[in-house]
Amino acid sequence: MQNGSNVTLIAPRRIGKTGLIHHVFERMKTADKRVQCFYVDVFPTKTFSQMVQFVANAVMGKLDTPSQSIKRKLNNFIAALRPTMSPDPITGAPTFSFTVEPENARETLTQVFEYMKESGQMCYLAIDEFQQVSNYNEIGADSFIRSIIQFVPNVHIIFSGSQQHLLSDMFMSPKHPFFNSSQIMTIKEIDVEKYGTFANNFFKKQGREMSQDVFTYLYNMVDGQTWYVQKILNRLYRTPKEELTKKTVNNAVGIILAEQEINYQNNYNLLTENQALLLTAIAREGVVNAPTSLDFIMRYRLPAPSSVKLALKSLQDKEFVFQTEKGEYIVYDRFFGMWLKRLE
């Protein structure tokens, strides 16, 4: 980022990419107080205009200096955005929120980037779950975004997302506007030994110690996925008098699953019979290479391969199942997978 490159950050959800982005931004702001960093999560957006509204709310008004009048900014940049002004509850400084109409979305996004350009400040913008752009009905939304950002030299962007196949296609396929427009980066699991040492530093402050063997056991339960590891560690940290053993790890996981019982039951009830059968089979298997193979189908009494294929696609679309880089299929939510294994 400091060398002027845009970055595409690809990683499964809950491995820690959002935390990494915020950490990098904090490091950059510490190194240079003049830089401006903005984070926008566009996962909830369904339309291009909603995405533009999210970006506008994150950026507009944040680069003003005390000497710059609100009126000038309203007149020059944001009058068309239907701004609503309110005082910041802590500083008292004016803050803005915006409503973007679909017919004004392109003009608005142009104004947002023009605002950053005119500020003269070095700006870093992270757009998380950027693959949502590919789902918008707006024709040419990705082409327009690319055309805007390439002419703003003081703005550098992190395109982040969790749906690897969509992001890879957007940034690595010659038929898409973002082809070769950024540096592709992926996040892997934290090294188990380094992670164990890091976690143990906190337990030592409680007068306890977790052996590397126990931590590796915990780590492997959830495939080293950061959010799940942290969830278990947090549960263990809240019981400072217990010895840190594999048994206490299992107890902690049991409590977590019990807390989510209603949510998991509701998710399960929303599935069709074929989807539920396949998802449970994948959970019990752990990792599945060929879900439509005769061996797998017979072992778990699944329907015909064509029905399994249809159920698999639906489970992937709903993000119940994730396909790894190796082409293997796993239950996306590791705790949900553990809960499914317990079903009769």
Where are these regions (language model features)?
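P-loop NTPase nucleotide-binding core
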Residues: N3-V7, A11-I15, G19-Y124, V155, ...
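Sensor-1/coupling segment of RecA-like P-loop NTPase cores
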Residues: K117-Y124, Q132-N137, F144-K175
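Helix-loop-helix "sensor" segment of P-loop NTPases
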Residues: D169-N220, E242-E243
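Conserved C-terminal helix/linker of AAA+ ATPases
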Residues: F215, R238-Q260
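C-terminal helical "lid" of AAA+/P-loop NTPase domains
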Residues: F215-M221, W227-K241, L277-T280, K313
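C-terminal leucine-rich, beta-strand-based interaction scaffolds used for sensing/assembly
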Residues: A258, I262-E344
